[in-house]
Amino acid sequence: MARTPTLSFDRGTLILHPPPKGKAWIEFATWDDRVERFRIPAIHYRELVEALQSDGTAFEDQARIFAPLPLVASVEMQPYPHQSEALAAWIEAGRQGVVVLPTAAGKTYLAQMAMQATPRHTLIVVPTLDLMHQWYAHLMAAFPDVEIGLLGGGSRDRTPILVSTYDSAAINAESLGNQYALLIFDECHHLPSDFNRVIAEFAIAPYRLGLTATPERADGRHADLETLVGPEVYRRTPEELSGTALANHEVVQIKVKLSAQERDRYDELIKTRNQFLQDVNIRLGSMQGWQRFVQASARSQAGRRAMLAHRESKEIALGTEGKLRVLADLLSQHYPERILIFTNDNATVYWISQNFLIPALTHQTPVKERHEILDRFRNGTYKTLVTSHVLNEGVDVPEASVAVILSGTGSQREFIQRLGRVLRRSKEGEKLAMLYEVVAEQTSEENTSDRRRSTTTPTTAKFKPKPAQQPRQLEIVPSNPTSSPYEISAHVTHRAADSPLQWGGDHPEAPET
């Protein structure tokens, strides 16, 4: 009597032995001479099982060790319409896919809703330790009766619900692959990298949810998300959620002219760079063009001079003195609102911190000090913070109403993340969130800004400095939230989730054999 085929999990792959009759499974399998067995990538587990079942093939499933997990939230909240719509779209797509929502639009609660609608062992993967601890705190509050653990930062738990960093999940992908039925990838644009993608490829999880504000990647690998997680099933922009889930907001572009000296030097540097690019037939504007420029700059003295000229021209555009005058004016206009200032480099962060007496946050700031600064910003002790990239992602930033981008990259993701830092609705009522993007006029930064703002419709303004004022003596002012040492401008332009629904059927059970 023929033995029943057995499907087993082996370090990120599946082994099906003895080979079953029929042909439905063959397209997934590759013969492995080392073990004399057919081997299938773990990521094809769901498709393989569905193919075997549709072919009427009997088999024993020893691959999965995940199990049902009763999830009852301690507090039920009424979801926003876009959260209910996103959950419904994800369920309709077979509980696989990517949801694109802006920062502060409630992606964490949407994930909780997905967990309640798919009550199985769940792995949540996040990019940073800060985010790992934020998710852990949220889930502990939501599901106090369920064992929740951490993987990363010294923790090595194995629990029904596990929160891990991408690094730790990738390192342990071979052992995690058959333990979880639902994978949730926060900031899922990190997943397609060579190192991280094994988390999805070595997992048999039939249910997958990707969350991000900006799935697009400069290297084009965001296309791999459809294979690793599923198709994009739902998307909303900040503009579509403005005034409902997010605060009303306005994006203002302020153009600053270079000084005569800066302009002459900038034009000279750009001429040097462009002449070299023309000589070697390289066009910037794409990842491939930039990579060719970097390679060519290492091959000759002319290439090195061109690269140095490019860097100096960028420094002039990003750090022109005119931007600092604009910053002083904006700080005056918006005092005592909470303001976040973003720059492209730490040197500018520290210069602004020292000259404007503003707390600074960079990757060099110790964790304890960073938490203390953010706590003081949250309780109003600090009204303003200046930072480079450390607050773009993975840090719980207290509510702010104004963001000033003095310099940035061409990344649409970075722009949307920075905008998201001021979009959280105020607990005190309606607010108008403002994002000012200060760019140097007639420079490459102006073109970069246009790419960054491709998803928004900003107001454009040319900066006009205030009339010169008489010098004022520095004086100590009392700690009064309504008074400002600057001149202030008079006018400044729970509902329970759906009932558990086999993958897409009435019950999210793995198929029984």
What are these regions (language model features)?
Residues M1-E85, S489-S499, D506, P511-T513:
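Accessory DNA-engaging acidic/polar modules
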Residues V386, E393-G408, E414, M434-E437:
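A short beta-strand element within the Helicase C-terminal
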Residues H190-N248:
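Post-DEXD/H (motif II) to motif III coupling segment of the RecA-like Helicase ATP-binding lobe
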Residues Q288-Q364, R370:
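Conserved helicase/translocase motor-coupling segment
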Residues A93-M115:
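Walker A/P-loop
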Residues V422-S449:
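Conserved segment of the helicase C-terminal RecA-like domain
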